[in-house]
Amino acid sequence: MNGLEATVSSFPSVKDSVPLTRTAVQRTKASVAVLHLGCEKNRVDTEHMLGLLAQAGYRVDGDEESANYVIVNTCSFIEAARRESVSTLMELAVQGKKIIIAGCLAQHFQEELLQEIPEAVAIVGTGDYHQIVQIIERVERGERVNAVTSSLDYIADETVPRYRTTHAPVAYLRVAEGCNYRCSFCIIPHLRGDQRSRSIESILREAEQLAEEGVQELILISQITTHYGIDLYGEPRLADLIRALGKIPIPWIRMLYAYPTGVTPAVVEAIQETPNFLPYLDLPLQHSHPQILKAMNRPWQGQVNDRVIERLRQALPNAVLRTSFIVGFPGETEEHFQHLLDFVQRHQFDHVGVFTFSPEEGTPAYHLPHQVPEAVKQERRARLMQVQQGITFRRNREQVGRVVPVLLEQENPRTGEWIGRSPRFAPEVDGVVYVQGQGSLGSLVPVQITRAEPYDLFGQVVAAPEGFSWSGR
């Protein structure tokens, strides 16, 4: 039994659905709904599919229950994501829906999905979503479509229609797709292909379009954002891209997935010199111990972790550092884990995500000896999160009394309270700021922080003090 069959067999009846991003499209002959699962890179794919459908004459509404077809853009990064995707598919199958399965699960298990889910009328790979209109037309003619290519070289640019699903003031901008690294635990290169970067000119044109739409925060994403341009220009060009984006009239530009080897002095200098580029670094370090990093096929990283973090702290004293770690990797001993705990306590990261190792078929780590028991993985995750919670709470308490810029994203109509984020919080993964006072949706306001909790802040809108920095520097 393969990984997908095991997952499907664990859902004899689907009852536990999860909150999903739901967007639907309709036209006279057939209606199509789109459900988005997974990461923000997957979200961009979803938004392009929606844009293409709208351009072809489909009408965007919001009801997949009455739709003739439901597109599910799936995730297959780890077992938990796969279970979420399969749960959604099985729920729709029980309802008798005609399902179009897109995204990473489709790329990973195309034949198995067609066999196990007869309600699937089409399978669309990660490099094929731009053909969604033609695929639906083929389905409507009675064809069962397998549109999964092994040539993963496509990346959408600013000319491909896009229907954004984020809050109005926030947009993600994908600067590259795919990954040239081969970490032993990661299936992404198999699902997304090797890195291919967009040109600086293409990225700037899309950023300008988003600025015209009123976007206040632009978030750069790719598998390894700090390696942007290597494949296209023969050298990293992130520093040049940062400076170029500094001329775009968007108040906040944030970068996610900044791998430590790419955080060069040139990149740090570009961040220093670009006022609207937030000093927020998301560094997916995965572990600290050299032996575990070697087993992860990241042997270079143990030599640069401390050096990069110290350089960032010196050059950008107000930098916000987020990272993620994997605990319970095969062969991880208590000594290795203690090394990680000490590393986290030493560097006092602002935000940390902790994942337990998920053995993925098709990766070298799946076959490694000395697999760690699930109970030990969970216990280590809890211990690390407990340590980090105290650090994050202390970092948040340091904000009390300060006046910081906050982007207002939601309003509670009953209380008039706003929910927003300061530069130290990225969407979805970090905390929020609860704000009292006057403002408008999608605006940036100065807020004095009055109270802190372990993950969130509370404050009051005030007048901007003299010399106030709208990027939180």
UniProtKB/Swiss-Prot annotation:
Binds 2 [4Fe-4S] clusters. One cluster is coordinated with 3 cysteines and an exchangeable S-adenosyl-L-methionine. Residues 30-141 form the MTTase N-terminal domain. GO terms for molecular function: 4 iron, 4 sulfur cluster binding; aspartic acid methylthiotransferase activity; metal ion binding; protein methylthiotransferase activity. It holds the Pfam family TRAM_2. Disulfide bonds: none annotated. Residues 397-463 form the TRAM domain. Coiled coil: none annotated. Residues 165-394 form the Radical SAM core domain. It catalyses: L-aspartate(89)-[ribosomal protein uS12]-hydrogen + (sulfur carrier)-SH + AH2 + 2 S-adenosyl-L-methionine = 3-methylsulfanyl-L-aspartate(89)-[ribosomal protein uS12]-hydrogen + (sulfur carrier)-H + 5'-deoxyadenosine + L-methionine + A + S-adenosyl-L-homocysteine + 2 H(+). It is found in: Cytoplasm. Its cofactor is [4Fe-4S] cluster. CDD domains: Radical_SAM. Keywords: 4Fe-4S, Cytoplasm, Iron, Iron-sulfur, Metal-binding, S-adenosyl-L-methionine, Transferase. NCBIfam families: 30S ribosomal protein S12 methylthiotransferase RimO, MiaB/RimO family radical SAM methylthiotransferase. PANTHER family: RIBOSOMAL PROTEIN S12 METHYLTHIOTRANSFERASE RIMO, RIBOSOMAL PROTEIN US12 METHYLTHIOTRANSFERASE RIMO. This is Ribosomal protein uS12 methylthiotransferase RimO. It comes from Synechococcus sp. (strain JA-2-3B'a(2-13)) (Cyanobacteria bacterium Yellowstone B-Prime).
